[in-house]
Amino acid sequence: MKSSWVKRAALCLSAAALAASALAACGGSSDESGPPELTFFVAIQPGGTIEEVSKRCSEESNGKYTITPEFLPTDASQQREQLVRRLGAEDSSIDIVGMDVIWTGEFANAGWVEEWSGADKKAVTENVFPNVIETASYEDKLYAAPFNTNTQLLWYRKDLVKQPPKTWDEMIEQAEGLKEAGTIQVQASRYEGYMVFVNALIESAGTEILSGPEEVDLEQDPTEQALQVIGKLANGGAAPPSLSTSDEDSARLAFEAGESAFMTNYTFAYASAQAEAPEIGKQMGFARFPRVDASKPSKPPLGGFNLAVSSYSKNKDVAFEAATCLANKDSQKTAVELDGLPPSRSDLYTDKTVTEAYPGFAQLVKESIEESGPRPTTPAYQDVSLAVQRALHPPDKIDSSDTESIYDELKSKVEDAVKREGLL
C-alpha cells in the first residue's frame, strides 16, 4: 500500500510543477483493495511526534484506516503557501490538515476545511482551554481539533536577577543596570514572530488589534502604551545589537551563550538550555510574561496548531475519526514527551508527563495559556500581520516619547488590510 501511495505522490508532485489545477487530478488517497490511506499534511516535529501518533492511531483503528504523514516545508509561510495552492485547487489527496492557529479564519472562510459537530466536536473540545478552542473556531463554529498549544514565559538568569520583574518597564530598568550582561532577548525580526510580540503587548495593554474578523479595535491610549514599550526597549541599553533580526532560535542561542539576562520565548527554550548550555540552564529562572500596564495582568502569546479535515477529502468520515485520535489525550502526552509541546487539554497539567517536561513551571504554563491573548481570527490575517510588521519594523523607528504618529500609521495600515482577504 505504501509503495502505491508513493507512486501517486510522485505523480502529484510532477503535476504540481505543470499547473496547480492538475493537483486535483492527483487526488485519491484510498486503495480500493484495502482501507483508506489518509494523507496528513503537517509540519514536522524534530522529536518524532507526528510519526508516532500517526502510527499508533493507524494501529488502533484495527484496519479501518492508515495515516501517512506528508511533511510541509519548515518555514511557516511556505507551509501556508503550499496548502493554499493545493486546497485552492481542490486537491483531494489531502485528508487531514495540520493548521497553524492563525490560519483558521482564512481556511474556514474559503470553504477548504470542514466544520466539526456532534460527538466529534464534543470529543475534541473536552477539557480544552477556551482560548485554544477560540483559535480553532471561526464565526462561532469549530473547524479544527485542538492539538498542541504553546505560550511564552519570561526566562531570566537567577545568578544576575534576584527578583523577576513584573512589568516591561521594570525589566528594561533592571537590564540597563546590568550593563552588557543585561540585554533582553525577544523576537523582533520582520516575520510572524514580531506580530506575536506586538499582539501580546497590545493585548496586555488592554486593547486588541481586531475585535472581530473585520472590526479594527486598537484603542489609542493602550496601543500607544504598548508601542512605548517597543520604542523604549529598541532605543535603550537593554536592546541586543541583533534586536531587529532576532527570532526564537537566535534569542535562545544568545541566552545560552550568556549574552542576556532576560528572554521571552516559548517553552522549548528551557529543555534546550539544559541540554546545550547546562551552566546557564541551572541558573534559568521563569516567570510570567511581563505586564505592559502594572495595573493589568499580562496576556501572554498563544501559539500551536490544530487538526482540520479537508473539504475535498474522499474519506471525510474516517478522516474525522482519525483526526480525533491524533488530537486525543494520549497523542497530546506523546507530543509533550517527544517534542515538549504543551497540551491543549487543561486536565493534563498535573500529569507526570507534563510536570516532568516542565519541572516547577507546569502550572505557570497552564496559567499563561488560560490568560493568553490570541492573535486575531480573520480571513485577512496574513494581510493584517504584514500590515503590523510594515508599520512597526524596525522596532527602533518607534520613538517612545512620541508614539502618536506611529499609532496613526499602524491603525491606517490595519484598516486597509481588513478590507482585503488576500490568500497569498
For each of these PLM feature ranges, what is it?
Residues 84-86, 93-95, 124-156, 295-299, ...:
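A structural signal for short loop-to-beta-strand junctions that line the ligand-binding cleft
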